[in-house]
Each structure stands twice: as structure tokens, then as C-alpha cells.
Amino acid sequence: MKSYLALLSHVLNQGIDRTDRTGVGTRSIFGYQMRFDLQAGFPLLTTKKLHLRSIIYELLWFLKGDTNIAWLKEHGVSIWDEWADKQGNLGPVYGYQWRSWPAPDGRHIDQIDNLLRMIKEKPDSRRLIVSAWNPALIEEMALPPCHCLFQFYIDEGKLSCQLYQRSADIFLGVPFNIASYALLTMMIAQVSGLKVGDFIHTFGDAHLYSNHFEQAQYQLSRIPNALPCMRINPAVTDLFSFKFEDFELLNYEAHPHIKAPVAI
């Protein structure tokens, strides 16, 4: 995860201090890219321990097309609590756009199902894309999508994924995003009969909140460990049938967790 630490250092040392929607203030850069070889290990940060349970359950929640936090809370995941209304609703966020994008003619488009079909039928297609950025519904969302578009690419039987993230909370959010989309790529590769390739993470506004500077400096003082390995139940051949128990993280040695406040 040296590439992540390089991003952290780059923003701390060369970023521009700016105001932001939350009122906290950020130091940011515009335009940056990282690449992870998924055959070299699972890109889960080792310079601070991450809550993998939350990452996996959130991804399964997205794939369910769910937009209410009740299912997450049933499984001990609270990462969306601050944005939900009293009934637990978040509006038409990620899961809704991925699985039920509303078309002008009244249909609802299942982008994930379409993607899986195209990977098998047209593996050379340049249209292997899923978008969560729906301008018509942004105002109805509790939080507009930060990781808003991803595309797949198949080469010599290997599946790679590139994510475009318009807004990136480097200290808290980005480590989750890396692991989540790496895992999604592995899952789709498995059910499509492919090997994994690279995960490419492309950023628009990549920022550190001003109340994360000390934590970032502390994290940079730590020496990263070898990447762990993610084992996925090979019996699962349907993307929508995965359960939490189908994933096993091996050899994860991480430094202790570093607390930091969430900007709402």
C-alpha cells in the first residue's frame, strides 16, 4: 500500500488548503491515480487496522440494491448512520442506481445484471460501465455518490476495474473504497470465470480534512506490512448469492486503528 501512503504524503505536502461544504476545511489536489495488482495481494491498508466487516457488508448491501440502513445495522455496521433519516432511509443512493436506475420510459435498469451479461457476451466492449451519478436524483440523495463511476476491462482472461471518484476523503474513506472495489472485482471475476487483473483508482478532488492532518502524519510514520490474501468461497457462481461467510482474510497484520472524526 505504498501508493496510498504516497498519496497521503503528496496531499499533506503539496495540497492546496480550501474551504468545503462541511465547514471543516480541507487540503486537496485535483487529479490523481493509483494502480493495484490484485494478484499481488488484497489491497487492505496495513498502516492502520480497518474494519473489514463494514466493507464487506456495505458492498453486499449495495449489490442488494438496498438504500435503508436497517440491514446494515442488523449486521453491526454503522458507517451510514449519520446520513440516514429517522426511518433509516438514504434516498436513491448507490444500491438504487446500480440495480434500479430509472429510465425515462418508466423501466428500471439493473446496471449490475447488464454488466455481468456483457462481460460474458461482449468481453471486448468499451461499455462495461456502471454509474451511480444520476443528475436527476442528486437532490433526493442523503449524500451524492463520491465513488460515482466504474468500468471493467478484460485482457488475456484477466478482469481489471477502474473507479472514478469525484470526491475522496483520503484518511477515512479511500482505504474503504480501495478494498471495496478490489473485492467487487474479485467477485465479478469469479462468477465470470476470469482471473483478477488490476484495480485502478482515479480521483477528482482528493482531500485530507484539516482535523485529520495529525493522524495522517502519524500513519506515515508507520512501516507497512505485507498485503494479506482474500479467499473467496469458490462454490459461489452467482454474484447476488454471496454472503459475508464466503470471504476469509488471511495473513492480515496491521498497525492499530487510528481514530479520526467524520465530516458530515
Swiss-Prot record:
Alphabetized UniProt keyword annotations: Cytoplasm, Methyltransferase, Nucleotide biosynthesis, Transferase
Binding residue positions for dUMP: 21, 126-127, 166-169, 177, 207-209
Subcellular localization(s) per the UniProt record: Cytoplasm
SUPFAM superfamilies in alphabetical order: Thymidylate synthase/dCMP hydroxymethylase
Enzymatic class: transferase
Any one Gene Ontology BP term: dTTP biosynthetic process
Gene Ontology cellular-component annotations: cytosol
Superkingdom as given in the UniProt entry: Bacteria
GO molecular function: thymidylate synthase activity
Pfam families: Thymidylat_synt (PF00303)
Catalytic activity as recorded in UniProt: dUMP + (6R)-5,10-methylene-5,6,7,8-tetrahydrofolate = 7,8-dihydrofolate + dTMP
Residue numbers binding (6R)-5,10-methylene-5,6,7,8-tetrahydrofolate: 51, 169, 263
Enzyme Commission (EC) number: 2.1.1.45
Recorded metabolic or biological pathway in which this protein acts: Pyrimidine metabolism; dTTP biosynthesis
InterPro entries, per the entry: Thymidate_synth/dCMP_Mease, Thymidate_synth/dCMP_Mease_dom, Thymidate_synth/dCMP_Mease_sf, Thymidylate_synthase
Active site: 146
Family membership: Belongs to the thymidylate synthase family. Bacterial-type ThyA subfamily.
Protein task: Catalyzes the reductive methylation of 2'-deoxyuridine-5'-monophosphate (dUMP) to 2'-deoxythymidine-5'-monophosphate (dTMP) while utilizing 5,10-methylenetetrahydrofolate (mTHF) as the methyl donor and reductant in the reaction, yielding dihydrofolate (DHF) as a by-product. This enzymatic reaction provides an intracellular de novo source of dTMP, an essential precursor for DNA biosynthesis.
Database matches in NCBIfam families: PRK01827.1-3 (NF002497), PRK01827.1-5 (NF002499), thym_sym (TIGR03284)
The protein's assembly and partners: Homodimer.
Protein name: Thymidylate synthase
The species this protein was found in: Bartonella tribocorum (strain CIP 105476 / IBS 506)
